[in-house]
Amino acid sequence: MSDNVQQQVDSVGSVTEKLQKTNISRPRKYIPPFARDKPSAGAAPAVGDDESVSSRGSSRSQTPSEFSSNYGGRREYNRGGHYGGGEGRQNNYRGGREGGYSNGGGYRNNRGFGQWRDGQHVIGARNTLLERQLFGAVADGTKVSTGINFEKYDDIPVEVSGGDIEPVNEFTSPPLNSHLLQNIKLSGYTQPTPVQKNSIPIVTSGRDLMACAQTGSGKTAGFLFPILSLAFDKGPAAVPVDQDAGMGYRPRKAYPTTLILAPTRELVCQIHEESRKFCYRSWVRPCAVYGGADIRAQIRQIDQGCDLLSATPGRLVDLIDRGRISLANIKFLVLDEADRMLDMGFEPQIRHIVEGADMTSVEERQTLMFSATFPRDIQLLARDFLKDYVFLSVGRVGSTSENITQKVVHVEDSEKRSYLLDILHTLPPEGLTLIFVETKRMADTLTDYLLNSNFPATSIHGDRTQRERERALELFRSGRTSIMVATAVASRGLDIPNVTHVINYDLPTDIDDYVHRIGRTGRAGNTGQAVAFFNRNNKGIAKELIELLQEANQECPSFLIAMARESSFGGNGRGGRYSGRGGRGGNAYGARDFRRPTNSSSGYSSGPSYSGYGGFESRTPHHGNTYNSGSAQSWW
């Protein structure tokens, strides 16, 4: 045995001696195959060198620019960027605190982002592919355009109370940042809507705002424009130093400066897409978090930078509890569709976010509330969240736009399918049609019926997965599927261009829901048509529906008037609901600033009497849209 071992040792020694004589040695660095034939001066550096592309385990410390926006965190992340440390640059955001930021280069520029460097806003390079994705090509039908009735917005009555601030009549610098104006122009905006004319100077002057405006009037841009303009001018805020950063493992935490809360996933995604347009080539990085999607993917997204965050309340609370998001740096808080969030039971989550988490105090931030309706309980809630705010009411809250031609027809439940097909056969091929039903089962059943009848249709409701809902919206927006059957999930806030027809297959029990449903058409000054199937099952909203039609100067069919009289016989039906919630009539807080006493039932303290959102003192009612079964073209 010892002889065999000695022979093996001798053989190994001889091989080693031969290798030394032939000058063959193990390479000290790994050289990739594609670089082995190149001169040594041009060889790719080995993995592990300072110049190399880092491996997965060290990528965060090697690419500080990837995580340069609004982050504090563990010490090992501070090697490339000054996160939460004393070496950060001086900035002038709300007092010019030091530290917290180091905006690197390549990553953001490659993705259409700029950077904040040495107190200056450095605009990123243009990205033509990203521009086409964000803003579309010329005459792109998937992008909303200004309608032919856009100029009529100037006739809409506007009430502003709580401040003497002059409105702006066009997009100019000042008050808006010059780079933001370029993105506004790329987006196709030519003139501000009434809500934008007033919200821009109010927010840029530093005031809180409660804004009531008709659906489709540009509320989203109404808060994005002034917020982003201030952000572009003042730069990022310093990240607070995490006192526990060095005590064991702690997850990386995002510190956004703007938080936008919305009730539904679809609305959050829509706000996020609008934010991407106006943040293009700037230092501001927008992110979105919402339920129904992979939270790990959303965490990876905010790990790459999060300055402007759009979120649903439930998912945001989850991420706050996980320690992934801090609200200690919030300068702007936006509550969009606030009444809807309370209707959906989000008040505990909203109060936890605003009052229970580490949110900045009401004195340290600007708070904005935007919605189409603001009932009394919402205005009372505003006292806890807003300070010395300006109340803005554009048009009569709870009404509909005269840009929408409304028609109510009497259809029994058993005849609805046949009646629907009659309508769809008369519609032009261009344009999109949105059909609202009350139940998820009916949405799927009606979609199958339309597909079997050779109509391209899809559906969206709460039982569909987030991926299915996003896919359905994509097909509908692009026009590949021109008909969408939806439940209430699509009735609020969604801005889908080119929706020319809305059909209420099932009428809702709440007149506000009807307002939001038909508001999916006739947006941004464009015209639209809305038809409602009405029968005895809907008599509870007959009276309010008549008021709505009269305010918008629409035709009221005789059967609807008779049904309203029948439902109100011996009582006031459901009309009493509005005396407490704030819709039409009485001292409806939804139409005026509840801080101001008034003797007027309209909610406006002065000025002439206006009719609905049309804003005209007198107007001849619409005629000629009575249905005639002998002529399909007489629908509109």
Curated annotation (Swiss-Prot):
GO CC annotations on file: cytoplasm; cytosol; nucleus; spliceosomal complex
Phosphoprotein among keywords: yes
Modification sites for Phosphothreonine: T63, T128, T312
Domain Helicase C-terminal intervals: 403-564
UniProt-annotated stretches for the region Disordered: 1-100, 571-636
Motif DEAD box: where in chain: 336-339
GO biological process: cell division; cytoplasmic translational initiation; negative regulation of cytoplasmic translational initiation in response to stress; regulatory ncRNA-mediated gene silencing
Pfam families: DEAD, Helicase_C
UniProt family annotation: Belongs to the DEAD box helicase family. DDX3/DED1 subfamily.
Additional record remark: A different form of ded1 has been identified via SDS-PAGE studies. It is uncertain how this form arises in vivo.
Protein name according to UniProt: ATP-dependent RNA helicase ded1
Gene: ded1
